[in-house]
């Protein structure tokens, strides 16, 4: 007697849209059964005898895989982060609302199989995303699973990660929340300022080589530049100096990062004029 639940059984027919979907994800399945299982809800299995399995077990494995891959990526990217910051950043990336959103953006709803009357809840998309990562791992190995997580989870949450990390840097030092200001000059420079309690603690003026004019993009770039500055080692005593000056209640002198190959004698704005310019444009 043929066992309908035989785990080596291959699906007889693979939907063309399902094949095209994986091609769009740059995935070439070797064993399609893993991927079919990843999109089957337990309610569908209960109502259909031909259904092999639900995504429950794959979801369990995928949850652990995503945690591991993201943790490893953060460990490599942020050597100066302590255990607490690494943990909080990982939680921010893999939280359910992010996974649910990504699953919806990838149009998982076109392929999820549910029992009759079962609604499409938000958490379904995140569950299937976790199951899909496990399916990729089981079929193609950790390298391909790592590639998928980095491309579709890590990169898609990078802006949120950067913003979270930027403000966490100050929270970790028990400093007030900083303010980021950006402005464009007539000679195509991007002026970026970070303020603390109204004092400028860091500023940067760089050519707007990509001609960005979106304020959110410019602020994102400013936070990224500041974070990279700290990672470079140049800012090793940055926060301790800031805290000492706050404790002594002395005016803080801004640290300015200058670009190369710019005639600063002709272009260098005075700090006061720079601050007024940004305030006027904000």
Curated annotation (Swiss-Prot):
Give GO cellular component annotations, separated by semicolons. Answer: cytoplasm
Keywords from the named record: Cytoplasm, Endonuclease, Hydrolase, Magnesium, Metal-binding, mRNA processing, Nuclease, rRNA processing, tRNA processing
The name on file for this protein is Ribonuclease 3
Q: Where in the cell is it found?
A: Cytoplasm
What is the organism field in this record? Answer: Mycoplasma pneumoniae (strain ATCC 29342 / M129 / Subtype 1)
Annotated residues for binding of Mg(2+): 59, 127, 130
Cite the PANTHER family for this sequence: DICER-RELATED (PTHR14950), ENDORIBONUCLEASE DICER (PTHR14950:SF37)
First-listed, main subcellular location of the protein, grouped into a coarse class: cytoplasm
Task: Name any cofactors this protein relies on.
Answer: Mg(2+)
MF terms (GO), sorted A to Z = metal ion binding; ribonuclease III activity; RNA binding
| Highest taxon listed in the record's lineage | Bacteria
Per the record's keyword annotation, is Oxidoreductase included, yes or no?
A: no
Q: Which GO terms describe its biological process?
A: mRNA processing; rRNA processing; tRNA processing
Oligomer status and interactors: Homodimer.
Sum up the protein's function in the record's words.
Digests double-stranded RNA. Involved in the processing of primary rRNA transcript to yield the immediate precursors to the large and small rRNAs (23S and 16S). Processes some mRNAs, and tRNAs when they are encoded in the rRNA operon. Processes pre-crRNA and tracrRNA of type II CRISPR loci if present in the organism.
Catalysed reaction equations from the record: Endonucleolytic cleavage to 5'-phosphomonoester
Q: Which residues form the RNase III domain?
A: 18-141
Pfam families this protein is in? Ribonucleas_3_3
Q: What class of enzyme is it?
A: hydrolase
Report the sequence similarity comment from the record: Belongs to the ribonuclease III family.
